[in-house]
Amino acid sequence: MPERHTLPARYYTEPSWYAAEMERIFAQMWLAGCRLDQIDARGAFQRRDVAGASVLLVGDGAGGARAFYNVCRHRGTRLCDVESGVFAGSIQCPYHGWTYDLQGRLIGAPQMDEVEGFARAGYPLHGVACAVWDGHVFFNLSDSPAPLREQLGDLPARFAPWRMDELRMVHRVEYDVKANWKLIVQNYNECLHCPIIHPLLNRMHQYLGAANVPSTETYCGGAMGLKDGVETLSVDGRRRRAPLPGLGPEDQQLVNYYAIYPNFLLTLHPDYMLTVTIWPQSPDHTRLIAEWHFHPDEIVRPGFVSGDAIEFWDVTNREDWAISERSQQGISSRGYTPGPYSNREQLLWDFDQFILKRAQGDQRGREEEVGSQGDQGGQGAKN
C-alpha cells in the first residue's frame, strides 16, 4: 500500500474526540454484551456500562434475552449496582420500591394510586434493543437500530462450523488497561510485534503467515496457521481437548482472529473460543472482559482441563495490555508525531478509516492532516 500514517495524538487523548466516539460509534452500533449461557436462568442478568449508559441484560428462562436501561422510571435511581446476579422474579428500585417484572412492566408503585390519572402501564423500564447471534448477546443503544445481521455481514456463515452457541464459559478475567480503547483493537490486528512481545505466542504461530480477509465497515480479521507440531494455542502447544465437532481438518490447523467493531475481539481455536469485550472508560482507560469457552462434552469429561489455554492467553493478554499502556504514554507525550504503517498493518489503516468515517463523517481531513507527517521529526505532538 502507499505510505500511510498513524492517527494524530488527539484521537487518543482528547475528551471531545472520545465523546464523539462514544456518541457516534458506541451509542449507534451493536455491542457484544455477554453470552446467553451467562443469563440462561430466568431473571439472571449481566450489567454493562458504556457511552454514558448502564444496561441490564436479562434472561427470560426460555433461551432468550431482554435489555433495559438500569434506571428507575420514578426519579431516575440506578436499579442495580452489581455486575451480575439473578433477579428473583422482579426488579425493585432500592429507593422508593418501584417494582418491575422481568419484561420491564411496572407492577408496583407505592402510594402512586393516590395520583389522579396515574397508570402503571405508562411507566415500563426503558427498553434497549437486544439480539443474539450464536450465543453472543448484543445490545444497541440507538432508538432505531438496523438489524444485527447487517452489522455482522457474512460472519454468521463464515463461523457456522464452530457452532459457537453450543460452547460454554469456563473462565473469566477482567483487566483495567491505562490505554485508549483503539490501541487495544490495533494491537489485536497485527502480529509484527509477536517476536518481540510474545515469546510464547511466537513459538506457536507463523506470525508472517496471516491470511486476512478484506475489511468491511464493521469488522476486520483473518486466520493464522499453527506451526508444525502445534495443535492449539496452549502453554505447550498441545491440545488436551477434542477438536470442536463442526471443524474440518483445515480449520483444525488455524486460529481465527476477528475484530467485530466496535467492542468485540473474537478468537476461534480448534478446541475453544476466546472472547474479549471492550468497555472504554475514558480516553486513556479501558476495561476489558476476557472469557474462555469450551464445548460442554469436554467440560463434563473426566480429566477435563482448561488451565493450559487460560494461562496461555492470560500471559499473552497481559503482554499486550502492557505494551498498549506504553503506547498510550508515548502518544500522550510532546515527542509524538504520526509514524508510517508497514504493508502488514493494512488492517490498522482500515480500522482508522472506520473510526474517522463513523465519528466525524469525513475522511478528507485524515488524508490532509497525516498524509505527510513522516518528515516532521523533532516537532511536538500534532494535536
Whereabouts are the PLM-identified features?
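Short Pro/Gly-enriched beta-strand edge/turn motifs at strand-loop
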Residues: 28-38, 109-114, 257-262
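Small-residue-biased low-complexity repeat regions
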Residues: 361-365, 371-380
